[in-house]
Amino acid sequence: MNGDLFKITLISVIAILLAIIGGLISADGDPVSIAVAIAPFALAGLYMMKEKVWYLWILIPPLFIPFSINSYAPLFAYSVVLPFYLWNVMLRRSSLTWNSIPLLDTFIFLLFIHVAYVFLTHPFGLGINILEDYYGGKGYIMFLQALLAYLCLSSLKTTSQELGKVLQWSIALILLFTLAQTARPLLSPESAGPEAGTDGDTRNFSYLAISVLVLQVLILKYSVWQMIKCPWWGLLAASACAGILISGFRSSIAIILLLFFIVSLLYKRWFVSIVAPILGLAMLMLLSSSKTLLELPFGVQRILSVLPFLEVSSQAREDAMASIQWRVEMWKWALDDREIFIQDKIFGDGFARDINILKANIYEEAYHLTNTNQISFAWNGLWHSGPISTIQAIGYVGLTLYSIISVIGMVYAWQVGRIYRYSKYSLGILFVTTLYFIRPLGFFFLYGENTYIAEDIISLGIIKVLFCCAKREGLYISIHMRREYVPLMIQQKEEKPGLPSSSGIPC
């Protein structure tokens, strides 16, 4: 007892001293000084978490959502936590394992080998993206953090309940920090820029991120009937739908509809999955016949213009068609061998851009030598297409490997979703599995970038851990395992209770 009191007192004194020193160091507001001041407390916290330190692999990335460097959050999380994770293994507080799915592991490591080859033939070089920000080898860094995360998750020994609990906590953090990201430009417009959240005064996507996230969580957590019985959830779902519709982003509403359909199939809600689309189309046709759709905001009409039998404003339909034609024209450039936007379509041009080409592009833009920004998007690899951007970076070889990985991953994501759909932490698990299941579909048919591949590999690492946990816990039985055959007559004889004989002696 006295020993514990002494430890608590000693730690408290040291913490007070570090707090005073940290306050003096960070008084000037320098980010480096603040980081130095916070570092001792962060390291102490990592040490005190002991075998639970791997929780931070899942919980740290959501904290970066409001910041521009959120793409690199997994690299920070896994690289900082890994030494403490291995330290606990050395002290035997926890142990390592290998969560193995041989076929998936093989193709993922083949993809990493191919990316390494592309890096050696097209090394990292600093490029300038005149549309947004500086970039060059971001794709290589994304794949590096994906490799680190996949190896760490593959070595993680845990239970499905524990991992599901952490995933559920992460959803709460994602909601909180996405809300902060949404509120910041609304509360402080000067920090968001003059065009933040709008597109030519016709579309408003200020609430798009939080609306999509809220609706995803509601679809995963509640059925349509539950939302009807609880008006508050139904009202929240309707508000989220409105936030997506006024944005005018057709891909966002397509992802939500696809998620709704997948979840309905997962829970075998056949009636809802069939009747809901029919009722929705009937209502839209009724509103269209009464000219009501023409009074809706521009963003809503732009989304509905995808259905040719609905009557929307000509401006909304023309804007939507122009967007499609604009992209298709760029895609033709990319696949045309006479053009030079993609040099090596087989193995890829890598993730870094040629600085000389970009300088020429800057010159043309500065002197208005080009009358469209299509050229700028093309030179900078902003194709608005997952397959095209992947071909430019890692070629047909990389695209083929990713396609195979996606098919394998979707199979395991579906299996994991079916196994844990009724578990205590089903929300956290389904948030990973179902969103991954629809991710390749969106990548190939809606919108995607080559960096999405690295993000998908991290999700696959989590799915692999959940699948291996299910095998260890007896929740999954392989279809290749057959039970011992017992003839039907013997089964009936064993199930039939013994009848007493006339002599009173059991038969």
Regions found by a protein language model. Give the residues of each.
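A juxtamembrane structural motif centered on a specific transmembrane helix
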Residues: 1-7, 230, 415-430, 434, ...
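Alpha-helical transmembrane segments of multi-pass inner-membrane proteins
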Residues: 39-44, 145-190, 200-267, 504
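Helix-loop-helix junctions and helix-breaking kinks within/between transmembrane helices
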Residues: 21-33, 68-78, 200-205, 231-272, ...
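Membrane-interface helix-loop-helix junctions at transmembrane boundaries of multi-pass membrane enzymes
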Residues: 49-52, 90-106, 219-235, 267-275, ...
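A membrane-periplasm/extracellular boundary helix in multi-pass inner-membrane enzymes
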Residues: 242, 246-247, 264-318, 339-340
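Long extracytoplasmic/lumenal interhelical loops at the membrane interface
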Residues: 191, 321-325, 329-394, 413, ...
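N-terminal hydrophobic segments of proteins, predominantly signal-anchor/transmembrane helices
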Residues: 44-144, 226, 431-438
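Hydrophobic transmembrane alpha-helices and their immediate junctions
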Residues: 105, 377-383, 393-437, 499, ...
